[in-house]
């Protein structure tokens, strides 16, 4: 996290995209769409305890989250998989869903600043 309380780390991405603002903007627009879809899928499939579709959503966002050093997303996703496997109570699933909703919303806001 940098001094502005941002959670997205664009430094690696900037290097990969040759520090080209147009490329970064294009990537950010696509990532906004990906994180919006993931945020919705995460909550839906977690609360339904639909492990198959939950894992598909996680695998789809994982490379983007890694590129942006978003370990908190990866960690919460792994935690939520355990909640499903261990058949934890719904309130724990809801807490994870709400946490991921907040994280993804902040990520989307930060990405939109780059568009």
Locate each region found by the language model:
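Two-component system phosphorelay core
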Residues: 1-56, 60-62, 66-115
């Amino acid at each position: 996290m940098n001094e502005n309380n941002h959670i997205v780390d664009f430094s690696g991405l900037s290097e990969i995209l040759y520090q080209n603002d147009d490329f970064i903007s294009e990537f950010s627009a696509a990532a906004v769409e990906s994180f919006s879809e993931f945020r919705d899928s995460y909550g839906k499939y977690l609360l339904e305890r639909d492990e198959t579709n939950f894992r598909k959503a996680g695998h789809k966002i994982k490379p983007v989250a890694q590129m942006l050093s978003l370990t908190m997303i990866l960690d919460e996703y792994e935690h939520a998989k355990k909640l499903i496997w261990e058949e934890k109570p719904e309130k724990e699933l809801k807490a994870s869903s709400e946490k991921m909703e907040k994280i993804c919303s902040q990520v989307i806001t930060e990405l939109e600043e780059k568009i």
